[in-house]
């Protein structure tokens, strides 16, 4: 009797994906945009609900109604110090209902052995360690640099922060294959252009404890 294929779904903090195991190998399934990962974003407009790439692509124009990082709230109280820290990076509003979390979740990673059936060997993870954590460190670093250079605090401007975060995401990807990345944002805040660069060594220094925790 031929073996049936198995489907695995990764609902990640930042990105989600679906894979199928068949013919002895795993294949990651592309979404309707042709991408193998889908941003864990949902957005609400006056006429529709957007999910994934469509939601993330319009976040700069609709920051207050675009939700992401939802997994960071799982199992935590609203007054949790970690939640309060994360809220500084969210353009949308989060609020409490009796101070209690309304959703729960499980760990992120499971190790299985697959023969005739499957056996779970280990389960572990950290719902509060994802790509956004690395982005946040770089965003905070550049917010401080902008204030030091120009004497302006863009930390409370949601649109400026979103543009800066998008640039940081691109820089992070560049640093995976290059030793330095440039960040150039015209009229980032109050008409001030922001041009800077970050080295891979500096990025690793900013995120040293996160790398050690992976």
Swiss-Prot record:
Gene3D superfamilies: 3.30.30.30, 3.30.420.40, Actin, Chain A, domain 4 (3.90.640.10)
InterPro entries per the UniProt record, alphabetical: ATPase_NBD, Heat_shock_70_CS, Hsp_70_fam
UniProt GO MF annotations: ATP binding; ATP-dependent protein folding chaperone
Cell membrane is among the record's keywords: no
Superkingdom of the source species: Eukaryota
Disulfide bonds: none
Pfam families: HSP70
Keywords: ATP-binding, Nucleotide-binding, Stress response
Family the UniProt entry places it in: Belongs to the heat shock protein 70 family.
Listed name of the protein: Heat shock 70 kDa protein cognate 1
Organism: Drosophila simulans
């Amino acid at each position: 009797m031929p073996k049936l294929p198995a489907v695995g779904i990764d609902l990640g903090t930042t990105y989600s994906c679906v894979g199928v195991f068949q013919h002895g190998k795993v294949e990651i399934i592309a979404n309707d945009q042709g991408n193998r990962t889908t941003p864990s974003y949902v957005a609400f407009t006056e006429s529709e609900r957007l999910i994934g790439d469509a939601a993330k692509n319009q976040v700069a124009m609709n920051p207050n109604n675009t939700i992401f990082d939802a997994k960071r709230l799982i199992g935590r109280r609203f007054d949790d110090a970690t939640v309060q820290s994360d809220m500084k990076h969210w353009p949308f509003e989060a609020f409490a209902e009796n101070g209690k979390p309304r959703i729960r979740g499980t760990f992120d990673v499971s190790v299985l052995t697959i023969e005739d059936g499957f056996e779970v060997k280990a389960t572990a993870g950290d719902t509060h360690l994802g790509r956004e954590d690395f982005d946040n460190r770089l965003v905070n670093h550049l917010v401080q640099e902008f204030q030091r250079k120009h004497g302006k605090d863009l930390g409370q401007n949601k649109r400026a922060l979103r543009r800066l975060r998008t640039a940081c995401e691109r820089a992070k990807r560049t640093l995976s294959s290059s030793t330095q990345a440039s960040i150039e944002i015209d009229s980032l805040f109050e008409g001030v252009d922001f041009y800077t660069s970050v080295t891979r060594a500096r990025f690793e220094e900013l995120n040293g404890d996160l790398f050690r925790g992976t």
